[in-house]
Amino acid sequence: MKSVCFYFKIHQPYRLKRYRFFDIGNDHYYYDDFADDEIITRIARNSYMPMADTLLEMINRGNGDFKCALSISGTAIEQLQMYVPECIDKLRQLADTGCVEFLSGTYSHSLASLEDPEEFMREVKAHDDLIYRLFGRKPSVFANTELIYDDDIAMLIASMGFKTCLTVGAKHVLGWKSPNYVYRACTAPKLKLLLTNDKLAEDISMNFNNPEWDEYPLTADKYISWIASLPEEEQVVNLFMSMDTFGSFLPAGTGIFEFMKALPVFGKEMGVQFTTPSDAVAKLKPVDEISVPYPISDIDEARDVSAWKGNELQREALSKLYAVAERVSLCDDRRLKQDWEYLQSSDHFYYMSTKNMADGASHAAFSPYDSPFAAFTNYMNVLADFLVRVEEQYPESIDNEELNSLLLTIRNQAAEISSLKKEVTSLRTDVMNAEEKLPETPEATAAPAKPARKPRAKKAETAAKAEPAAAKAPAKRGRKKAE
């Protein structure tokens, strides 16, 4: 029986406000809160929430037969919590069904896997911790930013304990091979790979509402029949796409939600089931290994990383940003680290692309800037202020090794002080407990003594008091006789 593995991605960056050269050193807040609020509220109401309701209906109608996977960046979660908290509740409902697998990824949808392995691993941990806190699910399958992958990244992913990774079925990598199998990484044989079927995924995301497409209109029964007619040995079809495709790029009026709801119905008729990545790799064995010496991604026609690193503007911005990665990781300034997280989002570099033709149109459609050069200038102004703040924390005159040594000493001393404080507190508690257990002394148990009577005056004192009285008495009698 053939399986379809749907993977839906949710991501939103923190958009930068207009930041001029004269703001450097004076304004340390970089974000366009109004744009973030407006965009994520609109997309959540038009896309994320209706799609979540659609998936819930598909799951409930089939008594749990429909399954899929979901990937949400940390920055998207933060914005949903701030502006559309009811959307988080919808996602929790999906998690509670047990039919939706939450995937691992980078917190800010960053390019750290291409620039800094340590920062990449830190981001993945931060993302997965957030997913666990919110949805009670610990991700075990990895999906990198826009499915970026190569042989070196495979080793990093495997070293973090992941057994499965999703990536793109790029033609220049697969050659004559089909993406509809489970593969393994050549540099990490225990890491299983699920590759997206670009053609079938684009038939929904790109062609569903295209009247010039030769297969228009696309219906659920037609789509499922294409999958069912694939060669018998091709057992898994991976369809990876952005969740805002549904309701935003393909508005509800196109019938996209009804199309999705009908898929499980026709799937049951034609022997096609729906699965999660974990279930797919549990049932199917890898048929071959895949070697990817150069990075691939799910963006643009070339299926490489030129969308973010294709020109000097992008490479310069990335180089400047990640040059301070180690220093930022060593600091304890919460606000500085938060800005570091947000400035890593791949979207900032995507807006700087100078590509032409179809790729260029796609970049321009998503960009809030008038041109790639405006995107670069604004980002570099923000980055300049950020670097000034990093310099204030840790001057460049101190090299990283010396800085690391000093900070390690400070942290060790802080840990020792904390340990000693705990020891003092423990000793005080022990002393108090010991005092309570001591037996009471006889004096403490004896009845309280009656108050002492006033002591009698000594005889000498009595006589001394009597002498003046005696002296006065005879004198009085003598005066009477004289009279």
Q: Language-model segments: which ranges?
A:
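Short, charged, surface-exposed secondary-structure boundary motifs
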Residues: 113-115, 173-181, 203-205, 286
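Intrinsically disordered, polybasic Lys/Arg-rich low-complexity tracts
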Residues: 429, 433-483
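Short, well-structured secondary-structure segments
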Residues: 3-8, 14-17, 21-116, 140-143, ...
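Generic structural signal for well-ordered alpha-helices
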Residues: 52-56, 88-92, 121-131, 154, ...
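An acidic- and aromatic-residue-enriched active-site/binding cleft used to recognize and process polar
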Residues: 8-13, 73-75, 107-110, 136, ...
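Active-site and substrate-binding clefts of carbohydrate-active enzymes
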Residues: 1-46, 181-191, 195, 210-213, ...
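Acidic, His- and aromatic-enriched active-site or binding-groove loops in soluble protein domains
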Residues: 87-104, 125, 137, 158-179, ...
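Alpha-helical scaffold elements lining the catalytic groove of polysaccharide deacetylases
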Residues: 110-133, 195-231, 252-253, 309-317
